[in-house]
């Protein structure tokens, strides 16, 4: 039969959305985090005046783009990274989430498991499926935080990566990022921190896993949520020297 693409979870909601509209006339759709506010005026202006700027970008992103990303991380999260060696552009972080297990498996073919929060964004499991890997949900506690102590040692030994997402989608849990980084280093597992909601906090400063060092971790950032630029397919990863890790 070969590989059969599994149905995307959002598509499975279409029937329920239709039934709700038929019964009540409309539905409050919480299935996807599409921003409803306008993008920053400066971005709209820049896009409207860039129609003559065409060309293929470098695979890692231009030095200007990576420098801007590193500057944002420093200003907003207090994370200091080297834009030349610790930042890489990605064409949308959803694509990064969905494809990274494939590249990690090329590097470490003896491992075949993707760990991710049991209550989470569906693309973590989808990325595992596309790579031919096992998708293993890590239990969360009553506050929706990742319970690292619940990871089966057998799964840890087979893990390519561990996804963390804080504040978490959809429940808003706040993970212990230092504990996640330490767990990854102890078990030789790359920790991928999806930080697209990092600034969505009720109080207190936003947090990044990069505050606990770049060894063995990658922080993934998107412009879709925090800048109301969904569909622009712009993001970047920062951490374990991605510029020197061509397979990541």
Show the residue positions of the predicted features.
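Conserved core segment of the aminotransferase class I/II
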Residues: 213-248
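PLP-dependent aminotransferase-like
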Residues: 102-166
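Helix C-cap/helix->beta junction micro-motif
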Residues: 20, 24, 131, 186-187
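A short helix->loop->beta-strand "cap" motif at the edges of active sites that frequently abuts
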Residues: 112, 186-189, 215
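Hydrophobic/aromatic ligand-binding patch that stacks against planar heteroaromatic rings
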Residues: 127-128, 183, 209
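Active-site phosphate-binding strand-loop segment of PLP-dependent enzymes
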Residues: 142-203
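N-terminal small-domain helix-loop-helix segment of the aminotransferase-like
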Residues: 2-95
């Amino acid at each position: 039969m070969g590989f059969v693409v599994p149905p995307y979870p959002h598509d499975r909601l279409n029937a329920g959305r239709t039934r709700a509209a038929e019964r009540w006339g409309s539905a409050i759709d919480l299935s996807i985090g599409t921003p409803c506010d306008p993008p920053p005026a400066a971005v709209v202006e820049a896009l409207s005046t860039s129609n003559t700027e065409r060309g293929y970008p470098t695979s890692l992103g231009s030095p200007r783009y990576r420098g801007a990303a590193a500057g944002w991380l420093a200003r907003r999260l207090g994370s200091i990274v080297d834009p030349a060696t610790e930042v890489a552009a990605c064409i949308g972080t959803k694509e990064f989430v969905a494809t990274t297990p494939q590249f990690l498996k090329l590097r470490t073919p003896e491992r075949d498991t993707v760990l991710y929060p049991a209550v989470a964004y569906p693309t973590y499991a989808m990325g595992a499926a596309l790579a031919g890997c096992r998708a293993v949900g890590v239990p969360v506690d009553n506050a929706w935080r990742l319970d690292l102590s619940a990871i089966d040692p057998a799964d840890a030994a087979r893990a390519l990566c561990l996804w963390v997402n804080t504040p978490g989608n959809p429940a808003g849990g706040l993970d212990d990022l230092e504990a996640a980084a330490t767990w990854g280093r102890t078990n030789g597992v790359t920790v991928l921190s999806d930080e697209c909601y990092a600034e969505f906090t009720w109080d207190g400063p936003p947090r990044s896993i990069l505050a606990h060092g770049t060894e063995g971790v990658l922080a993934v950032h998107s412009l879709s949520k925090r800048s109301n630029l969904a569909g622009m397919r712009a993001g970047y990863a920062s951490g374990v020297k991605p510029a020197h890790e061509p397979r990541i």
